[in-house]
Regions:
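Divalent metal-coordination and catalytic microenvironments
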Residues: 47, 109, 138, 160, ...
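Active-site HxH/HxHxD metal-binding segment of metal-dependent hydrolases
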Residues: 61, 89, 105, 111-187
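Histidine-centered catalytic micro-motifs
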Residues: 134-144, 208-214, 276-281
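N-terminal secretory signal peptides and thylakoid transit peptides that target proteins
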Residues: 1-20
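Metallo-beta-lactamase
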Residues: 30, 126, 130, 155-206, ...
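Conserved beta-strand hairpin/beta-sheet module of binuclear metal-dependent hydrolase folds
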Residues: 39-123, 216-232
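Active-site metal-binding loops of divalent metal-dependent hydrolases
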Residues: 55, 110-112, 139, 165-166, ...
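Cap/insert and terminal regions of metallo-dependent hydrolase folds
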Residues: 3-5, 223-305
Length: 305
């Protein structure tokens, strides 16, 4: 039986008038605001600043129909359970990356629409007309959607860079998004091949498969390195731990799987961080070899020191 001391009895008695004076329901007066993420994170890579920008999120039902089309339901459920994520629902992130080289502001991809990327940039203290270069990793709508809006180009003073094979493919594809978002800017584009240089310290690397000319981009400054991995892996568990699982959006599924193994094999071997467009925000981490694939290790404070 609990023992009531004289001191605890006095404290309880003192609290009674306060409790009586509170209106009914006062404890629930603050409305719930819902789950939220920050709009940006900024870190250092040698002499560069790297800012990830959350341009949007989108929940998805039946994720196996997107991220594991050749996996059995049992295997998909088992891997999901092992990683503490639901089997029947997922959350997709859309995360462009801004690199400040000290001389230029280089933006990788633009999100679904101008509103998402400009809002994230504003939170990071950057205006759209400050962007010097926009690099497009590939031409899917969630990467080119922020290029233009009703008022014209979002990044009025920028020049544009993308892969030659990617631009060539979409130029003849009759794609509405490409024709409306990219073609009007064609005279401002520079096309690069594997090994091409955007500016000093930013180099193109072919990772074809997700699209016919999908590229990743290697950053290096002051002896530090990072990979902008774009859509090489579309999910931090299903695509990384099982690189052979097919993704609905991959144009060439065998080539995409080979690209995942090649790119993340290099990232893991060299122990360098990467930014992945659809990774959980802030969308940066490391790839650790694990069985047939890789385990995503979220970035901590390594680039804050």
């Amino acid at each position: 039986m609990p023992h009531l001391t004289r001191r605890s009895a006095m404290l309880a008695a003192a609290a009674l008038p306060l409790a009586a004076s509170l209106p009914a329901g006062a404890a629930a007066a603050q409305p719930l605001q819902g789950a939220a993420f920050p709009a940006f994170t900024r870190s250092r890579l040698g002499g560069f600043e790297v800012t990830t920008l959350l341009a949007g999120t989108r929940p998805m039902d039946k994720p196996q129909e997107t991220f594991g089309t050749n996996a059995s339901p049992e295997d998909f459920a088992a891997l999901s359970q092992a990683n503490f994520i639901p089997t029947d629902r997922s959350l997709n992130f859309f995360t462009p990356v801004l690199v400040n080289t000290g001389a230029e502001l280089v933006l990788f991809d633009t999100g679904l629409a101008p509103e998402g990327i400009t809002t994230a940039l504003a939170a990071a203290g950057v205006a759209p007309d400050q962007i010097d270069i926009v690099v497009l990793t590939h031409m899917h709508g969630d990467h080119i959607g922020g290029l233009t809006g009703d008022g014209g180009p979002t990044f009025a003073k920028a020049r544009y860079v993308t892969g030659s094979a990617e631009h060539n493919h979409w130029s003849g594809a009759g794609d509405k998004g490409f024709d409306s978002k990219v073609k009007p800017l064609n005279d401002k584009f520079t096309m690069l091949d594997d090994g091409g240089v955007v500016v000093s310290g930013i180099t193109a690397m072919a990772a074809f498969g997700h699209t016919p000319g999908h590229m990743v981009w290697h950053l290096e400054s002051g002896g530090q390195r990072m990979m902008i991995a774009a859509d090489t892996a579309n999910h931090y568990v299903w695509s990384l731990q099982r690189p052979d699982w097919e993704v609905r959006f991959d144009a060439d599924k065998a080539a995409a799987a080979a690209a995942r193994k090649k790119v993340f094999g290099m990232i893991a071997a060299d122990r360098i961080p990467f930014a992945g467009y659809h990774m959980p925000f802030p969308a940066q981490g490391y790839a650790e070899p694990a069985g047939e694939g890789f385990r995503f290790v979220p970035l901590g404070y390594q680039l804050m020191l």
